[in-house]
Amino acid sequence: VLLEVLGFRASLWAMAGLLSLVLLGVVVYVPKLMGKSKASKSAKELFAKNQGINLLAAARVVLFGARDVWFVVGVPVFLYASGWSRPMVGGFLALWTIGYGAVQAFAPHLVKRSPDGLSTEVPAARLWSALLAVVPVALAVVVYLDVPNLEWVVVGGLGVFGFAFAVNSSVHSYLVLAYAGSEK
């Protein structure tokens, strides 16, 4: 409804404005000491002792941020602008979510497990990350070339992206635990 009434840009500005009002309400009305923790001794306490965990955490922030931008704003707007009805867009996103979960559950069967828990898994994470980086670039080229049946080509590309993303996410989750070792 918001897109139909205000359009895309104005809708984003309206949502940003409403979130700003919520933030202002939190600042004004939430008690000052609520949720306040003890001051940390240094900024180093925010990070794990293991560099692998810190790198994976940074990668996950970027991965999930990219996924959320695509699937909260970009994909629904693209599909709706391509003539898909709301139920079709919602159905696609529902199937996407179910498929994503199925791939994540199957991911341990795709990545061979090594005795040390890292020697096979780290290269696998690099491989799946590279694939994940290539797919959006390929999709951008396809959109630029304006191929016939563009929305279906994009949907297929998003399927490949989702598959790679789900495997990547699963491998990253495993590696965080593997790197943590006794810190679990």
Regions found by a protein language model. Give the residues of each.
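A membrane-interface helix-boundary motif in multi-pass transporters
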Residues: 3-17, 149
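Helix-loop boundary and gating motifs at the non-cytosolic
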Residues: 52-97
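Hydrophobic transmembrane alpha-helices of Major Facilitator Superfamily
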Residues: 65-70, 102, 163-171
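C-terminal transmembrane helical hairpin of 12-TM major facilitator-type secondary transporters
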Residues: 121-172
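Intracellular helix-loop hinge segments at the cytoplasmic ends of transmembrane helices
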Residues: 77, 169-180
